[in-house]
Amino acid sequence: MDNHIKGALLVCLAATMWGFDGIALTPRLFSLHVPFVVFILHLLPLILMSILFGKEEVKNIKKLQKNDLFFFFCVALFGGCLGTLCIVKALFLVNFKHLTVVTLLQKLQPIFAIILARLLLKEKLKRAYLFWGFLALLGGYLLTFEFHLPEFVSSDNLLPASLYSLLAAFSFGSATVFGKRILKSASFRTALYLRYLMTSCIMFVIVTFTSGFGDFLVATAGNWLIFVIIALTTGSGAILLYYFGLRYITAKVATMCELCFPISSVVFDYLINGNVLSPVQIASAILMIISIIKISKLN
């Protein structure tokens, strides 16, 4: 098989796995506390990676500068902790009714990344960014509320869930910006291991002072099975597939392949939960995704 085709298929597979996770896996952990869920979602992959290559990566981590470690901490704090806390909370709030909306709103992440890159990294902002950024935000609003005001559609926790999803997109976008500062400091494997290590440590502190660890006794066998499936597939497994695929394709091709995420989210939500987007929501999702693609090409 041609390497370009292989790379595209791997990115498509990773994006589809993330879509399946947001619809079918993580929402079914709703009986547990959110901080505990996020902690375990990072701890299990960390344990697996520690067994496979932990000793080698600890040596690589010791070689990093303090400045690099600070930015790694920021990536773990925003991308690993805050972003994941917000998106898991959003998925739990909607009670399987608006999962597609919550997952699709994450696609606004590049908007926040571009804004933060302008503010923090002083990167130039083209006028076209503003145009497509506005259309993306408009599409996100119509996807969530259609032609209504937020207060009129606040049933089913859609409004707070949407806000949590947007905050997650902002947090993931922040992690992307901070990640730009450390791309040349470590390999992807080292960066992935350190991110999960720091996130697990931060979440341990958060769980200690919030929900506690009582969920270890409350979690059912089904909960632990979902945790293991996520750890091996849609968690670190999907990330590895994604970046392995990126080695063989361009960023523009990857952007198109990532459309498997929203498409699979819609399909899985229909097949598993019986939820269907309205015509207005479908049109809004298309507008938002096209705008994000345009922004990615500009970038």
Swiss-Prot record:
Reported function: Transports riboflavin into the cell.
Domain EamA: 6-144, 162-294
Family note: Belongs to the EamA transporter family.
Lipid bilayer topology: Multi-pass membrane protein
InterPro entries documented for this protein: AA-Vitamin_Transporters (IPR050638), EamA_dom (IPR000620)
TM helices/strands, residue ranges: 7-27, 34-54, 68-88, 101-121, 129-149, 158-178, 202-222, 224-244, 253-273, 276-296
Repeat as UniProt keyword: yes
Gene name in the database record: impX
Record has Signal as a keyword: no
Main location: membrane
Protein name per the record: Riboflavin transporter ImpX
Compartment(s) where it occurs, according to its Swiss-Prot or TrEMBL record: Cell membrane
